[in-house]
């Protein structure tokens, strides 16, 4: 386990490679077992990283209510919380233990201090793929900032009985399931492939919620043309950058205003008269902003060298070595390590 000083050196190397601050996710193993995690978050914040998240199973956040406050005070902006479903059978199948109460408590402790949470759902056919829309509604009810659905990848330890490499869940499966389960509230076409690292890796949908409902922003503006026009596909896009880009479009687009005014049921408290920018700032207020994502990690059955070469999601190792995320975590068909700890 690297020391805090070693982590700082690794982060400085990352800044050098990237040419400036970027998004940062502190992962593991399980990062919350480190007592110096708040110190590491502060180091990252002082180095200028734009969005700092912790990737966690939530156990320590549930057991230690003070941890969430310590992390917020240190500069943490979000938690990427492993959250596979609502029922004990899902966790028993995927994690070997019932974690339902642990997940609830972790969410509660994060909400108490205003720490944003993204639910990270590993989707396994026949286990939890029937709960996808319910998970979205649950996330909205708990005022999470989003849900990221991750079709199961055969990495490391997993129950072999749950996986058939020729009959696996894909990003398209997730999108179609959401469309079916939501009865059209969400559509598969609402999701836009993310060019970085590769369109086959990820897809995103942006929305806002008001009065307990989710409305899809992608349908109100031409998001694809927006991404191309402002070069957003080549850079990390935080909320402020997205907001500014859409605000520029609003100033020149009567079509957006017509769409917005025709949706009084979307964020009703935000639909007020006034300048386009003020309307947009209210309409897309961050606490009502919601993102749904799908990310398909590669495993030994689906590895693609072209995708690996284009990867922009890296593990940072000692001496500033950057390794594509999927490559670093890849294991053999029997679960043995291939590269972790060797590169």
Mark where each language-model region is:
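Flexible mid-to-C-terminal extensions adjoining Fe-S/redox cofactors in radical SAM and related proteins
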Residues: 233-343
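Short acidic, gly/pro-rich beta-turn/loop elements at beta-sheet edges
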Residues: 64, 91, 129, 157-159, ...
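Canonical Radical SAM [4Fe-4S] cluster-binding loop centered on the CxxxCxxC motif
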Residues: 1-5
